[in-house]
Amino acid sequence: MSGLRTHTNLDPSRVVNDFVASLADPRQPLHCTKFLHGCLMALNRKELGLANLQILRTQHHEFYNACVALLTVPRPRGDFNDETWGLRKDIKEGFEKCRCDTKDTFVQQIHAVSDSTRRIKGVPCPCSELGYLLFVVINNALQPAKDENIHNNAVKATQAGEQVLWPTKPHELFPYGAKESMEALILWLGITPEAISLGTIGCMLAICKQQILPYIVGSEILADKLADITEILRMAWMTQQQVPESTKLTPTSCLVDLGRIAFFCHMLVDLCNETELKQFAGRSVENLLHMGDTVLKWLPELQKSLQSLSATETHDIEYIRTYYIALCSRVHRYFDEPFDSTKFHPLIVSHSLQRLTQQGDPLMMAFEGFRRLADNQRCYAPGCSETFSSAGRRFHKCARCNLIPYCSKPCQTRAWKHPTVPHRSICKKLGSLVELTPLPSKLMDPMGGEAFVQTCKAKGIDEAIAADVAIHIKKIFKEMDTITCTLEFLLQNPILTDMFRGASKIQ
C-alpha cells in the first residue's frame, strides 16, 4: 500500500480492509461506532497531509464507497425521531454499542485512536461524531472532484494508463439510487447538523446536478435544516466570543463553515428554477428569510472578530453575502412577500424588487391591478361571490383607501382581518396611490397607465409601494380563484354538495 500512512503507524492495509469489511452491510456494521471512527481518524489526521487523500482517491475507491454507503443506505423512517430527525434512542444505542473483539490488539489500538481525539475517553463514540467525520472525509475528497470533469478525467486517465481518481462517476455518490440515497443522506442532518454536512451535499449537487436535484428540493426537512444549521453556527460563534476557551471554534473556522453553507445556497440558486425553489422553500419561507436577515446582520460582526482580514477572507465574506442574498431574495420574490424593509433585511428587499423590475415596471403592474379590480365589479372579500350585477347595485368602497368595494359590513370586516390577504396590511398604501395619482378616473383611459406611471415618478412614489400593491392584488385574485374552484368542484360532485349542506344544517 505504497505511501499510505496512518496515525500511530498502524498497518494501513488492515485499517482500510477492516473498515470496508465492517461495512459490507452498512445497515448492520460488524464493528461499533468507535472502531469505525478510529479507522477514519487513523487515515485522515491533519498531520498526514494531502498525500493520503490523493492515495486513497487513486488506489482505494472501496474506502470512499464504504463511507458513502454508510451515509446513504436507506433506513426505515421509524428509526428516526419525528421532531428532531435524530436516530431513536434505542437505535442509536444499538449502533454505538461495542461488540468488537477487544482481545485483538489491532482493535484495541483503533479504539485508542478514536479515544485520543475525543474529550471523554472510554465511552461509546456518538453517532453524531462518526457522522461528522464521514462528512469531513467525503467532503475533502469531493472538494477537488467538484472542480474536475469526472467523465473527462476518467477517459484521460484510462488513455494514459493511469488510475482514475474517486469518484469515477456521479453514480458512486448515490449507490442505492438517487431518490433513496439522497433521502437517507438528508436524514443524517438530524444526526449531524453541521455546516460540513450541507457543504458535502452542495458538492454532490455540483457533481451530480439534475440527477439528485429533485430529491434535494423535494425534502420536507432540508430547508429548515439549512436555517437551523446557520443559527447553530451563529450561536457557537457568540459563545466563542464570550468564552473563547469553551470551544475549539475560531472566527476563521466559523467563516469557513459559513462559506460551506453559502456554497449549498449557491448550488440551489444556480440549479433551481422558480418552481423547484418554491418546492424547496415550501413551508419554511419565514425561517429562510429570518436566516438571511440574521446572516446579513451578523457578517459585519464576524468580520470585525477576525484579527486580520486576508484577501481570501475578504473574498469569502463577499461570497457568503452574495449567495445568502441570492437565495433569500428569490424566496422573497417567488412567494410574493411584501417589500417591507422593517420586516426583512433591506438587501433582501432591494434585490427582490430588482428581480421584479426585470419582469416589468412595478408601477405599471400596480396600475394593471387597479384596472382589473375595476373591471370585475364585485365584492372583494375572499369567499364572497356577490357582484354588482347579482346584487343589483354598486357596492360601497373602503372609506380608508377609497378603492376596494365590499357588498356588506361583515364582508369588509372579514376582509380586513383575512389570514392570507388582510386588507389592513395594504389599505394605507392603496390610499396613498389613490390620493396622489389620477385614480380611479384614468383607469379606463387607454393612456391612463402612462399618466399613472409619470405621476408616480414625478411625486417620488417608492416603487416598493407599487410592487406591494401589485402583489397584494395578485394574491387577492389567487385567493378568490382558489375558493371559486373549490365551490365549482363541490357543485360538480353531488355527494360532496349534500355533505356540505348537511354540515351547514348541523351548524
Go through each PLM region and give its residues.
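Generic structural signal for coil/turn-prone sequence and helix-edge features
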Residues: 1-386, 433-507
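Glycine-rich, flexible loop segments associated with nucleotide phosphate handling
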Residues: 253-258, 392-400
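Cys/His-coordinated zinc-finger cores
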Residues: 388, 397-426
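Flanking scaffold residues of small Cys/His-coordinated metal-binding clusters
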Residues: 374-379, 393, 402, 422
